[in-house]
């Protein structure tokens, strides 16, 4: 019997997170705060993206001890990041029993030409995308869940908005095309034809697509849900704020009740200072994490 997780099971696990918030944590204490706030899963890593950005150098998979401490601290699913194309980091995380692996541009890529063949793993994967071409290539490789790349560690929502709007606009374009136009569109996007055909018929991606990269306030989370996100990843925004526990609960509530503006106003009161943001135009080309991968 194959030890590879089936596509249906992997995608079903991602569907169970729909409508929720997944939070980056670096220790057991933060993981407990996230779970108590209502997070549907946590991402265990050594440093949040803002600290990875500030430190520079090569960012790698977290120490397995951190992953195990987080696993032992919570009952919700635990995710962890592997470098793009790093087969062994992914296998190590699979051996640790994580519930999901993020093949992440937040870490320094191990392979600038090839992403992981995620179909070969039992554990499901989440990957980032900026457009429908990237989205469908990752799905073809076996990704069971997508997220916008945004610009991690900046506290600036503008790139996540751009990526979510672009993917959804391209889905609408494909859905309106005749089948004889799809092959040319597949060529233009660098997208597998069969996946575009499925997207045309269904009018949506075959996997969930969360928002990530720059979510820093309850209003940011609600905005991404209104733009069509299936849920929200929050990296640096929570534990770089003045009051992480209160901030975490507020973002979870805003994600759930994303059209209740009165509630979002109440949730946004007296949260303290949000993380200090970065203007995207001030980043050098080599500092733009979203450019990693293809």
UniProtKB/Swiss-Prot annotation:
Organism: Bacillus pumilus (strain SAFR-032)
Reaction catalysis annotation: aldehydo-D-ribose 5-phosphate + D-glyceraldehyde 3-phosphate + L-glutamine = pyridoxal 5'-phosphate + L-glutamate + phosphate + 3 H2O + H(+)
Task of the protein: Catalyzes the formation of pyridoxal 5'-phosphate from ribose 5-phosphate (RBP), glyceraldehyde 3-phosphate (G3P) and ammonia. The ammonia is provided by the PdxT subunit. Can also use ribulose 5-phosphate and dihydroxyacetone phosphate as substrates, resulting from enzyme-catalyzed isomerization of RBP and G3P, respectively.
Active site annotation, chain numbering: 81 (schiff-base intermediate with d-ribose 5-phosphate)
EC assignment: 4.3.3.6
Quaternary state and interactors: In the presence of PdxT, forms a dodecamer of heterodimers.
Broad EC category: lyase
Assigned protein family: Belongs to the PdxS/SNZ family.
Keywords: Lyase, Pyridoxal phosphate, Schiff base
Top-rank lineage group of the source organism: Bacteria
Classification lineage: Bacteria, Bacillati, Bacillota, Bacilli, Bacillales
Name of this chain's protein: Pyridoxal 5'-phosphate synthase subunit PdxS
Record flagged with keyword Nucleotide-binding: no
Stretches of the chain forming a coiled coil according to its record: none
